[in-house]
Amino acid sequence: MKIALIPGTFDPFTIGHLELVKIASSLFDKVVVCILVNPNKTHLFDEDARLSMIRRSVEAFSNVSVDIDHGYTADYAKKIGAEYIVRGIRNEIDAKYEMEMADFNLKRTGVRTLLIPAPEEIAGISSTRVREELKQGNSVEALVPEEIKSVL
């Protein structure tokens, strides 16, 4: 069974994240979307809210599950038997960073990383942008999955 991990903070989950799930679910037998908790970050949504948002968004995918972990990405990938860590890249800055992390994770645990470029029409969408729009009182309906619009 080919298992993939999609890690992130998902604060909140966006249509960019959902696109990554769609692609990964078609490539792998099992996909785990894992909220990785960084205690040094301040979050707009708590762990339970993010878990609920993601579960609602991915419930149509029978081979996708959602989890929370407080450790390192590569360690969690190894723990669940993932062969790949799946990451989206929106621009050259993302690509450079993700390539460095992919190399680190491969050397540390032997887990490979699959980098998937974001389609141009959603490349500008990020959780940071959603949080900024929410703080300014703007609509985020075009940025988040249908299943969580009512929560935001």
Region locations from a protein language model:
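Nucleotidyltransferase catalytic core that binds NTPs
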Residues: M1-L152
